Amino acid sequence: MNTETNALPAWLDKVRWDDNGLVPVIAQEASTNDVLMFAWMNREALAKTIETQRAVYYSRSRKRLWFKGEESGHVQHVHEVRLDCDEDVVLLKVEQVSGIACHTGRHSCFFQKFEGTVDNGDWVAVEPVLKDPEHIYK
């Protein structure tokens, strides 16, 4: 498949893309079922993910494909790709290289846990930084 020629496969049409041509994606660690991160994909990103078996997302801020780990080396090897019952969310079951998925140097982007009550609560970091981000992104 050559995704450069815009000849994308028909199976992509089953996905319910939003008005911007994007679909939300959850990356889950295949071995532990830990939820690692949330991101977005466009058609090209999903096709490249299937083709290469490595996670490729779409960066809304940079407006381009984001090959997970292209700067940090923390790539995600994709074991399985699933589509939810409404066909509007993609789940990637991945092997997270180095164990770090988050740009903060943590295993998961979901490292903040709410503790307390609605009137007296706050978000608390409950996962350690595994590697200082200044040493990840040089």
UniProtKB/Swiss-Prot annotation:
<dbReference type="GO" id="GO:0004635">
    <property type="term" value="F:phosphoribosyl-AMP cyclohydrolase activity"/>
</dbReference>
<feature type="binding site">
    <location>
        <position position="86"/>
    </location>
    <ligand>
        <name>Mg(2+)</name>
    </ligand>
</feature>
<dbReference type="GO" id="GO:0008270">
    <property type="term" value="F:zinc ion binding"/>
</dbReference>
<feature type="binding site">
    <location>
        <position position="102"/>
    </location>
    <ligand>
        <name>Zn(2+)</name>
    </ligand>
</feature>
<comment type="function">
    <text>Catalyzes the hydrolysis of the adenine ring of phosphoribosyl-AMP.</text>
</comment>
<protein>
    <recommendedName>
        <fullName>Phosphoribosyl-AMP cyclohydrolase</fullName>
        <ecNumber>3.5.4.19</ecNumber>
    </recommendedName>
</protein>
<keyword id="KW-0963">Cytoplasm</keyword>
<dbReference type="GO" id="GO:0000287">
    <property type="term" value="F:magnesium ion binding"/>
</dbReference>
<feature type="binding site">
    <location>
        <position position="85"/>
    </location>
    <ligand>
        <name>Zn(2+)</name>
    </ligand>
</feature>
<feature type="binding site">
    <location>
        <position position="88"/>
    </location>
    <ligand>
        <name>Mg(2+)</name>
    </ligand>
</feature>
<keyword id="KW-0378">Hydrolase</keyword>
<dbReference type="InterPro" id="IPR038019">
    <property type="entry name" value="PRib_AMP_CycHydrolase_sf"/>
</dbReference>
<dbReference type="InterPro" id="IPR002496">
    <property type="entry name" value="PRib_AMP_CycHydrolase_dom"/>
</dbReference>
<keyword id="KW-0479">Metal-binding</keyword>
<keyword id="KW-0028">Amino-acid biosynthesis</keyword>
<dbReference type="GO" id="GO:0005737">
    <property type="term" value="C:cytoplasm"/>
</dbReference>
<keyword id="KW-0368">Histidine biosynthesis</keyword>
<dbReference type="InterPro" id="IPR026660">
    <property type="entry name" value="PRA-CH"/>
</dbReference>
<comment type="similarity">
    <text>Belongs to the PRA-CH family.</text>
</comment>
<comment type="pathway">
    <text>Amino-acid biosynthesis; L-histidine biosynthesis; L-histidine from 5-phospho-alpha-D-ribose 1-diphosphate: step 3/9.</text>
</comment>
<keyword id="KW-0862">Zinc</keyword>
<feature type="binding site">
    <location>
        <position position="109"/>
    </location>
    <ligand>
        <name>Zn(2+)</name>
    </ligand>
</feature>
<feature type="binding site">
    <location>
        <position position="84"/>
    </location>
    <ligand>
        <name>Mg(2+)</name>
    </ligand>
</feature>
<dbReference type="GO" id="GO:0000105">
    <property type="term" value="P:L-histidine biosynthetic process"/>
</dbReference>
<comment type="subunit">
    <text>Homodimer.</text>
</comment>
<keyword id="KW-0460">Magnesium</keyword>
<dbReference type="Pfam" id="PF01502">
    <property type="entry name" value="PRA-CH"/>
</dbReference>
